[in-house]
UniProtKB/Swiss-Prot annotation:
InterPro entries, per database record: Creatinase/aminopeptidase-like, Pept_M24, Pept_M24_MAP, Pept_M24A_MAP1, Zfn-C6H2
Source species: Dictyostelium discoideum (Social amoeba)
Protein name per Swiss-Prot or TrEMBL: Methionine aminopeptidase 1
Residue positions binding Zn(2+) 3: 202, 213, 340
Transmembrane spans: none
Zinc finger (C6H2-type) in chain: 3-57
Length: 367
């Protein structure tokens, strides 16, 4: 408990014990005290935190769910809509991506994109980067992920594009916001960001018939060294994988390099979520696993467009899905970090279509 002070108002002494009920409920509350006396004095107020953490205050589908970590869902506002005049993907109305299902049934091979298609995706990648940077610059202590979703939604619409996650298999928001132990596909809600959080924002745009996908993990306030190391490891894993991309590289080789680096840093690599082909379809071939000894098929060819998005965990690589059918969390409740780019294979290597235009992530967030 080094560095933690007593939660009793006006005390300020170093904490020596923690409320056992808060521990059992995995509550993110002021729960440390310097002595039994302070604990008993503050108890009439402190016990109110326990009421807030009880299942009856959670969305109904969570009331019998055993959470793996301290994060809890809060209220989710109604789904927004795109205004008239915005080109819609095939799932925007009915929620089912029919074109993806047709491609799956036909087991379509990796697509070789034309120079004209790549130019559209190049412009789209730049737009997607602009939107993500707007969200990243806005994220701060006290802001809710719902507010970030509004920012993303408006920024996408202002660019004449559609936020690809919106109503994709009924996903209710315009971006994914994944906090702390959430690996991916977190749903923006009304929980305020807190000092020490790590937050991943995942943005995808649909424009002129194509999708572009990227994400980054941000440090909210003062993050501990272990958390910073986790985030930097995820960033480095993406960078080293991108550096390997060129004609002839086997897709399965990326996972070997990513896992080797993550394990060396004391972290693990998620196996159940992968990078993917992208273009006219939100998700298509190739599948791009991030773990070693995977069975990914094929080699990179000029014109292939796909994402790399390693998810790196502080503890176990295993995950489970919340009852909302979307939010993927670590099985042990420890934190996860992720970074993603969309890139195209060229004659001489690759071009990152979602690259930064204002300095590297590390330069901006770790110095």
């Amino acid at each position: 408990m080094e560095g933690i002070l007593c939660a009793s108002p006006g005390c300020g002494k170093p904490a020596k014990l923690q409320c056992p009920t808060c521990v059992n409920l995995k509550l993110e509350t002021p729960s440390h005290f310097c002595s039994q006396e302070c604990f008993k004095t503050f108890w009439p107020l402190h016990k109110m935190y326990h009421q807030k953490g009880q299942p009856e205050n959670l969305p109904s589908q969570f009331r019998n769910y055993k959470f793996t970590g301290p994060l809890r869902p809060t209220n989710i506002t109604p789904m927004r809509k795109a205004p008239e005049g915005i080109e819609l993907p095939d799932y925007a109305i009915g929620s089912i991506p029919i074109s993806e299902r047709v491609a799956d049934r036909k087991n379509m091979a990796n697509i070789i994109h034309t120079p004209e298609e790549i130019e559209i995706m190049r412009q789209l990648g730049k737009m997607s980067r602009e939107v993500l940077d707007i969200a990243g610059n806005a994220a701060k202590v006290g802001m809710t992920t719902e507010e970030l979703d509004i920012i993303v939604h408006n920024a996408v619409i202002e660019r004449g594009a559609y936020p690809s996650p919106l109503n994709y298999y009924k996903f209710p928001k315009s971006c994914c916001t994944s906090l702390n132990e959430v690996i991916c596909h977190g749903i923006p809600d009304e929980r305020p960001l807190r000092d020490g959080d790590i937050l991943n924002v995942d943005v995808t745009l649909y424009w002129k018939g194509f999708h572009s996908d990227l994400n980054e993990t941000y440090l909210i306030g003062n993050v501990d060294e272990r958390g910073k190391n986790l985030v930097k490891c995820a960033y480095d894993c993406l960078e080293l994988a991108v550096a390997m991309c060129k004609p002839g590289t086997l897709y399965r080789e990326l996972g070997d390099a990513i896992q080797k680096h993550a394990n060396k840093q004391g972290f693990s690599v998620v196996k159940n979520f992968c990078g993917h082909g992208i273009g006219r379809l939100f998700h298509c071939n190739p599948t791009v696993p991030h773990y070693s000894k995977n069975k990914a098929v094929g080699a990179m060819k000029v014109g292939h467009v796909f994402t790399i998005e390693p998810m790196i965990n502080e503890g176990t690589w295993q995950d489970e899905i919340w009852p909302d059918s979307w939010t993927a969390v670590t099985a042990d409740g420890k934190r996860s970090a992720q970074f993603e780019h969309t890139l195209v294979i060229t004659e001489t290597g690759c071009e990152v279509l979602t690259k930064r235009t204002n300095g590297s992530y590390i330069d901006r967030h770790f110095k």
